[in-house]
């Protein structure tokens, strides 16, 4: 892919086209690859954790909240 140009003395000048990857493009590909691996790895760990870890325990409901809920429903709280 060499382009030829003729100057005023009819000498032929051959310009070589730069072949290969631009260094900026190499950096972009490397960074994009690391980001892709990071997100794929996180997703794999998330799926693995969902399958293997037990579900979280719910916090116990306080007696005060239970009493308030029963009063809202119209049921008298025990002991009253």
UniProtKB/Swiss-Prot annotation:
Location, primary (coarse class): nucleus
Cell location: Nucleus
Entry GO CC: nucleus
InterPro entries: S1FA_DNA-bd (IPR006779)
Listed Pfam families: S1FA (PF04689)
Basic residues bias (residue ranges): 55-70
Biological process according to GO: regulation of DNA-templated transcription
GO function terms (MF aspect): DNA binding
Keywords: DNA-binding, Nucleus, Repressor, Transcription, Transcription regulation
Residue runs in coiled coils: none
Domain of life: Eukaryota
Motif Nuclear localization signal in this chain: 54-59
Annotated family: Belongs to the S1FA transcription factor family.
Identification of the protein by name: DNA-binding protein S1FA2
Record lineage: Eukaryota, Viridiplantae, Streptophyta, Embryophyta, Tracheophyta
Gene expressing this chain: S1FA2
């Amino acid at each position: 892919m060499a382009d030829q140009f003729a100057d005023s003395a009819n000498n032929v000048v051959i310009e070589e086209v730069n072949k290969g990857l631009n260094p900026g493009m190499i950096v972009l590909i490397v960074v994009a690859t690391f980001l892709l691996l990071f997100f794929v790895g996180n997703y794999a760990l998330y799926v693995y954790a969902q399958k293997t870890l037990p579900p979280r325990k719910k916090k116990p409901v306080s007696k005060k909240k239970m009493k308030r809920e029963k009063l809202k429903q119209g049921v008298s709280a025990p002991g009253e």
